[in-house]
């Protein structure tokens, strides 16, 4: 009997694979159907965001953050705004805080619907994306009614938010909440007890709590492994400390637990949105939405027609920008994908000296090899989907 040399073979997954979630290229080493090694090749969407921010004023830097995790844009702007406000020592009025929190939670739902439904599609369920995207469309319209843009909003700015919300919009967001919970029930009815869906997700991509912390996981990836770590609760920012919500936690750390947590988080987000809507249409119905510091926040149009000082301030703020006192600061928010952090170094000028962006997806993607080793080729898409990766923030 002749001897044969058996060797592993290598295949490319992506960068134009339908379930590669953007421009990801994975080099997979396979032993038959079993994955031996996963080598992510990133950088295909690198745009030099951090360097570009150094050449722009603090206000002009805001739109770059929309283009990182472009599924939930306002959450990124929020982190940058918090960092700059810390350096400036600004206080945001309560109405402005509530609007920020409301739209952060809308962003969370936008992201989770996208992830849960497309991950279901990757493992063979075709109906959830159709239902989920109908709801995403309604949320995109809320974005558009707040700031004029469906995606790249540039709405959350250092000092507050760009404009106040009209009362009809706040009411419509309130009316959207309960019917959406019914849609979530319908999606859960399709997936949660579905035999095929469970076979594709239960005990796939298991990560223990120690490993999750060692790899630098945050967000759903840590909560799926059993830690109730959520920055909205553990390091509260804005008015989250005044709001009531629960933090769903898994116990197995597999793809299925992460799916269940995302579903439950959407319900918690609706709970937060309802509280914000109640306050915005009740106790905080009227009030400023931005800081009253005229050296940072531009004046209203009406003021500019009456006051020469307002006109001068407006001109200076939009040409030169405001100067931020020298110092360094790290601000993080609980973005839908995990802890999104911004480390800003200011040198006293009108532009950031350095702006380091800590994207949660970057830490999650580096663990692909660890998570997929020993699984079958078909499980790679299930694991990748449950990591919730968007390439805008990974490549920056």
UniProtKB/Swiss-Prot annotation:
Keywords: Cell inner membrane, Cell membrane, Membrane, NAD, Quinone, Translocase, Transport, Ubiquinone. InterPro entries: NADH_Q_OxRdtase_suD, NADH_UbQ_OxRdtase_49kDa_CS, NDH1_su_D/H, NiFe-Hase_large. GO terms for cellular component: plasma membrane. Pfam families: Complex1_49kDa (PF00346). It is found in: Cell inner membrane. It catalyses: a quinone + NADH + 5 H(+)(in) = a quinol + NAD(+) + 4 H(+)(out). GO terms for molecular function: NAD binding; NADH:ubiquinone reductase (non-electrogenic) activity; quinone binding. The keyword NAD applies. It is a peripheral membrane protein. The keyword Cytoplasm does not apply. NDH-1 shuttles electrons from NADH, via FMN and iron-sulfur (Fe-S) centers, to quinones in the respiratory chain. The immediate electron acceptor for the enzyme in this species is believed to be ubiquinone. Couples the redox reaction to proton translocation (for every two electrons transferred, four hydrogen ions are translocated across the cytoplasmic membrane), and thus conserves the redox energy in a proton gradient. NDH-1 is composed of 14 different subunits. Subunits NuoB, C, D, E, F, and G constitute the peripheral sector of the complex. PANTHER family: NADH DEHYDROGENASE [UBIQUINONE] IRON-SULFUR PROTEIN 2, MITOCHONDRIAL, NADH-UBIQUINONE OXIDOREDUCTASE 49 KDA SUBUNIT. NCBIfam families: NuoD, PRK06075.1. Belongs to the complex I 49 kDa subunit family. This is NADH-quinone oxidoreductase subunit D.
């Amino acid at each position: 009997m002749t001897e044969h040399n058996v060797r592993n073979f290598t295949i490319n997954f992506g960068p134009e694979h339908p379930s590669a979630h953007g421009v990801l290229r994975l080099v997979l080493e396979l032993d038959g159907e079993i994955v031996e090694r996963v080598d992510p090749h990133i950088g295909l969407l690198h745009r030099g965001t951090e360097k570009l921010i150094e050449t722009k004023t603090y206000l002009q830097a805001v739109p770059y953050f929309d283009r990182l995790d472009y599924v939930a844009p306002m959450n990124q702007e929020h982190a940058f705004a918090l960092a700059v406000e810390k350096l400036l020592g600004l206080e945001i009025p309560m109405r402005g805080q509530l609007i920020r929190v409301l739209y952060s939670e809308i962003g969370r739902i936008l992201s989770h619907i996208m992830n849960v439904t497309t991950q279901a599609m990757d493992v063979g369920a075709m109906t959830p994306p159709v239902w989920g995207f109908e709801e995403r469309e309604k949320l995109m319209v809320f974005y558009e009614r707040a700031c004029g843009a469906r995606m790249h909003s540039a709405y959350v700015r250092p000092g507050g938010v760009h404009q106040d919300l009209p009362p009809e919009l706040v009411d419509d967001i309130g009316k959207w909440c309960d019917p959406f919970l019914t849609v979530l029930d319908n999606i859960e009815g399709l997936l949660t007890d579905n035999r095929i869906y469970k076979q594709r997700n239960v005990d796939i991509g298991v990560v223990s709590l120690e490993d999750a912390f060692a790899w630098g996981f945050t967000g759903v990836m840590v909560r799926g492994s059993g830690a109730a770590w959520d920055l909205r609760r553990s390091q509260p920012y804005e008015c989250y400390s005044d709001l009531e919500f629960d933090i769903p936690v898994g116990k197995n750390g597999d793809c299925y637990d992460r799916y269940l947590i995302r579903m439950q988080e959407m319900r918690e987000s609706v709970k937060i949105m309802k509280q914000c809507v109640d306050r915005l249409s009740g106790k905080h119905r009227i009030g400023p939405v931005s800081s009253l510091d005229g050296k940072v926040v531009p004046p209203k149009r009406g003021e500019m027609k009456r006051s020469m000082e307002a006109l001068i301030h407006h001109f200076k703020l939009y040409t030169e920008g405001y100067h931020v006192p020298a110092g360094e600061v790290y601000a993080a928010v609980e973005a839908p994908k995990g802890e999104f952090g911004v480390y800003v170094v200011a040198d006293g000028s009108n532009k950031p000296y350095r702006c380091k962006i800590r994207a949660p997806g970057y830490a999650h993607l580096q663990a692909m090899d660890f998570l997929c080793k020993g699984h079958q080729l078909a499980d790679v898409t299930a694991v990748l989907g449950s990591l919730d990766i968007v390439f805008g923030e990974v490549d920056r």
